[in-house]
């Protein structure tokens, strides 16, 4: 159960994966729910059985973010929306891959926070939850996606300092490989996508939702800053050492 001081929550990327699983957790809480996504067809079906508000929005549209979110009175913002385009690295990513993924994975987070956090400061309560990644904490062969999630890590850390004394909390959730649609958007080659999402038991969206809800459950004096969550069979941090074949020496 989340801390009772929170009366409203906004979840971005709420129609699938981690966002959808997190949304479902709030159905058991006494809280006003706002579920945001570009495609709301799944949310419309879910709303037939559960009470919550749907916000249809394209997070690539900065003006729309401010127009629709600035007047909302939100106690918890869960910035979860994201895309894996460009995850194969800067050499394989197209210019469009880089622009699109940076817009959603980094810029939309900043604009969403800019629109909502002032209300939290005014009320002297609130909780910001940012979806990071192990790719943002440990070097991997993913300079585009890893760089973007590295930016989220620094944003989370710096925002905590910026909000010091406001009683607004900031938590970053950093999952390892999770059974979502990430692989499909990250790799143009279906076989590579399948290989990326195999080889060991992946995390599931409910595992990440557990971590999010835990960060929201602690007493007001506690702030869960960063949660790293990886599969039991996944050990982040190590990278393979690949000898360079120098044509001059061979």
Range-by-range predicted roles:
Residues 93, 139-147, 158:
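Active-site loop-to-helix junction immediately N-terminal to the catalytic Tyr of the SDR YXXXK motif
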Residues 158-168:
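Active-site-adjacent segment of SDR/Rossmann-fold oxidoreductases
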Residues 104-122, 161:
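Amphipathic alpha-helical dimer-interface segment in Rossmann-like NAD(P)H-dependent oxidoreductases
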Residues 172-173, 192-238, 242:
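C-terminal helical subdomain
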Residues 15-16:
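Conserved glycine-rich cofactor-binding loop
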Residues 91-110, 125, 129, 152:
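Catalytic Tyr-X3-Lys loop
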Residues 133:
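Residue(s) in the substrate-gating loop at a strand-loop-helix junction
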Residues 113, 148-149:
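Active-site helix of classical SDR
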């Amino acid at each position: 159960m989340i801390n009772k001081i929170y009366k409203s929550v906004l979840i971005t990327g709420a129609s699938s994966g981690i966002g959808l699983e997190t949304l479902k957790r709030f159905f058991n809480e006494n809280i006003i729910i706002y579920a945001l996504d570009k495609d709301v067809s799944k949310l419309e079906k879910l709303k037939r059985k559960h009470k919550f508000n749907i916000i249809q929005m394209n997070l690539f549209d900065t003006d729309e973010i401010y127009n629709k979110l600035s007047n909302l009175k939100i106690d918890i913002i869960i910035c979860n929306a994201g895309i894996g385009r460009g995850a194969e690295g800067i050499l394989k990513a197209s210019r469009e891959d880089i622009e699109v993924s940076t817009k959603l994975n980094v810029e939309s987070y900043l604009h969403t926070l800019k629109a909502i956090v002032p209300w939290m400061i005014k009320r002297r309560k609130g909780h910001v939850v940012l979806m990071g990644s192990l790719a943002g904490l440990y070097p991997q062969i993913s300079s585009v996606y890893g760089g973007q999630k590295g930016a989220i890590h620094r944003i989370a850390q710096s925002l905590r300092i910026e909000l010091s004394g406001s009683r607004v909390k900031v938590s970053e959730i950093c999952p390892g490989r999770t059974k979502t649609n990430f692989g499909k958007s990250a790799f143009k080659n279906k076989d590579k996508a399948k290989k990326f999402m195999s080889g060991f038991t992946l995390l599931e969206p409910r595992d990440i939702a557990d971590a999010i809800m835990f960060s929201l459950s602690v007493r007001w004096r506690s702030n869960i800053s960063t949660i790293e969550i990886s599969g039991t069979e996944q050990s982040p941090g190590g990278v393979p050492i690949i000898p360079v074949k120098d044509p001059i020496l061979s």
